[in-house]
Structures are given as C-alpha cells and as structure tokens.
C-alpha cells in the first residue's frame, strides 16, 4: 500500500517484494518503479554503471516494454543432476530436454523398472512441476492467462497422473535426480566429483517446462522507487552491489578451500558481474572436493560450466509465490488429491486468477 501510494524507501529488493500480496509485475505496470536506463542516461558520473560489465542475458530479464525496472544482483541455474549409471538406460542414448510431455513417460519407465525408484525424492517436487505449468500460462505483467488450450488441458491431465503415480512411501525412494533444481556451484561440482569417483559420468537436465529450455532464477534484484528524490544515490548503491569485490566475496569466488561444513553458503548464488563470474568458476576448478581429496576433471568442469553459460531464460525468484500459495494453493491441493475433478479445477483456476489479476 505504501509503495502504491508513492511512499516507501528509495531502494526496494526483490526479497521484500516477494512478501507482498500484489505481484511485482503488477507494481511495475502501475509505475511504482523507475526506469533505471533513464537514471543511467541522466547521470553525469563518469564512472556510472556500465551494463556491458555484466551478464546481458540476466540483466535483460529486468526489461518490460523496453524499460529496465530492476537490476539482477545474483542468480541460480535450475539444474537437475543425475548420472549415467542411474539414468542413461531410460534416455534412448539421447539426453532429452525435459518438457511436460516427456517427463511423465520418463517417470513411468523408471517406476516400472523398480518400484522404489522415482525421478524425485519427494512428492512435493511433482507438485512444483504442476505449479510451474500453471505459472507458465499466467502473465502477471500483461494480466493475461490461458487455461483453455488443448495443450494446457493435456499437460494438466498428464502431470496429475505423474503426481498420483508417485505418491508413495518417501522413506524408501531412490531418486534419479537431485530434486530442488537449485545447486550452488561448489556443491554441484562436489556431487559431480563424487560421480567421477564412482567411475561414472554426470548427466545435467533442465527443470521441466513447456519448451524444454534450460532456465535460471534471479535470486536477488534491486528496484528504485519512481518517487525517489535520490535516484543517483540509489544507482551508486547498485554499482556497489554489482562491483567485482562485493560480488566475488558474496558468491564465494575468494574462498581458500571448499569444506561444506565450514563454507556453507559460499557460492550459493552466482554473480552477474562478468569478472566475478569468471573468478568463481576459476575457484571452483581450483579447489578440491569430496572432503578436500579430489579435483574435478577438465571435461566435467566444462560440461557444467557450458550448461550454465548457455542459459538464456531467467525469471525473478518468488514472482508467483503469493499466487501459488494464497490464490490457487488450496484448489491445486484438492485437485491433486482427487477431491475435485479436472473441469471444476480449471473453472475455479480461471475464476481465481481473473479476480487476482484484476484486483
């Protein structure tokens, strides 16, 4: 309410916005935030922010209708990790891009082979795939949704069956994939080193989505209030947050060794500063893994790095949190637990989404 009334702080973080009932993109459309490109253009500081120093794929996620409303600070790739010994026999010698169409087939092959095997360790992970399907069909900025297409209904049916077929005793499950999709860099290489140590090969897959593309989430971003009288000062703060030293220290590029018990959180997020990004990967290549006993091989170091380097699609973390929990959360649970049928679910989904978008 304070933000919408033109009050509040000069600088707002994405973490603060994720706690609000109004979506971040709705606030963007209502003119709450400044166009940061205008602030940069109007700045007379000779050392002002140079966007070329940062990852353009990630920075461009802050652009809506040609205007830059936020600057990403850190990000995480969405990665599902497995190994050749676990997964290759289900992949027909091809590494698939996971979509809503093929994930059910892959899961079924795994379940049929061994009743204790599953794609993920928790049934909650299958629910998250279902929620992602819904989110991909809701544009909070344009305030539009599409729940009427045959493709959407087909995916709803398929992912509901995927969820139902994996409601089992989680204590005995042997997961084929790391489940949450978010792996900090050192932990990713630690797991890959462990796979190498077993004379196995890593397999990296995307988290399932409509087009099967590799994706990432922006974990921290900074907005500037449109009503701020201190826009240049706010820009200086963004420059500081994106500086090589701050980004390298925060993201773990300067750690001396990787010890998960003492270095927890180092490298949890990836920097958008290009120099810091390079330093982080250089450090990840240099340190030892598996309790400080093993280096990562050059081939698998580059395998993971190339995957992260080539991610083109990013979105703000937490963008749909309120919508998923407070707006549609209970009807999703009812549908997945067979309390309501598909027609009633989609009818209610449309009604609630429309009300939320028009508020």
Give short role names for the model-derived ranges.
Residues 278-358:
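C-terminal capping/gating helix-and-loop segments adjacent to ligand/active sites or protein-protein/ligand interfaces
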Residues 107, 133, 140-172, 193-207:
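Glycine-centered hinge/linker elements that transmit conformational signals in sensory
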Residues 34-52, 95-98, 135-154, 209-212, ...:
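Short, solvent-exposed loop/beta-turn-alpha elements that line the ligand-binding surface or hinge
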Residues 195-272, 312:
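Extracytoplasmic/periplasmic substrate-recognition and gating elements
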Residues 15-79, 199-207:
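Hinge/lid segment of periplasmic solute-binding proteins
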Residues 6-10, 34, 67-68, 112-117, ...:
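Loop/turn elements at helix/coil->beta-strand transitions in domains of secreted/extracellular proteins
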Residues 61-82, 101-148, 171-183:
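Extracytoplasmic/periplasmic solute-binding protein
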Residues 1-25, 330, 339-359:
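Conserved N-terminal structural module of periplasmic/extracytoplasmic solute-binding proteins
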């Amino acid at each position: 309410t304070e933000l919408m009334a033109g009050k509040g702080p000069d600088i707002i973080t994405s973490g603060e916005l994720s706690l609000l009932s109004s979506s971040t993109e709705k606030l963007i459309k209502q003119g709450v935030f400044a166009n940061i490109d205008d602030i940069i253009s109007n700045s007379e500081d000779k050392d002002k922010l140079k966007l070329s120093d940062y990852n353009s794929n990630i920075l461009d996620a802050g652009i809506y209708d040609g205007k830059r409303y936020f600057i990403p600070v850190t990000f995480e790739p969405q990665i599902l990790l497995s190994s050749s010994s676990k997964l290759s026999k289900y992949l027909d010698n091809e590494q698939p891009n996971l979509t809503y169409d093929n994930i059910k087939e892959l899961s079924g092959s795994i379940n049929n082979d061994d009743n204790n095997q599953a794609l993920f360790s928790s049934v909650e992970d299958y629910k998250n795939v279902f929620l992602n399907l819904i989110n991909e069909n809701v544009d909070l900025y344009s305030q539009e949704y599409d729940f009427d297409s045959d493709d959407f209904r087909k995916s709803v049916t398929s992912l509901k069956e995927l969820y139902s077929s994996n409601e089992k005793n989680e204590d005995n499950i042997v997961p084929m994939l790391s489940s949450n999709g978010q792996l900090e860099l050192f932990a990713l290489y630690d797991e890959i080193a462990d796979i190498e140590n077993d004379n196995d090969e890593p397999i990296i897959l995307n988290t399932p989505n409509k087009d099967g593309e590799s994706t990432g989430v922006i974990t921290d971003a900074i907005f500037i209030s449109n009503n701020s009288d201190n826009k240049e000062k706010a820009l200086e703060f963004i420059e500081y947050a994106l500086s090589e030293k701050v980004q390298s220290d925060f993201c773990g590029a300067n750690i001396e060794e990787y010890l998960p018990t003492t270095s927890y959180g180092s490298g949890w997020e990836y920097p958008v500063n290009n120099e810091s990004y390079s330093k982080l990967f250089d450090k990840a290549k240099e340190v030892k893994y598996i309790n400080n006993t093993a280096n990562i091989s050059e081939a698998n170091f580059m395998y993971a790095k190339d995957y992260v380097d080539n991610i083109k699609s990013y979105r703000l973390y937490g963008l749909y949190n309120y919508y998923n929990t407070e707006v549609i959360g209970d009807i999703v649970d009812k549908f997945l637990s067979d309390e309501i049928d598909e027609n009633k679910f989609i009818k209610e989904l449309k009604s609630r989404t429309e009300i939320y978008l028009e508020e």
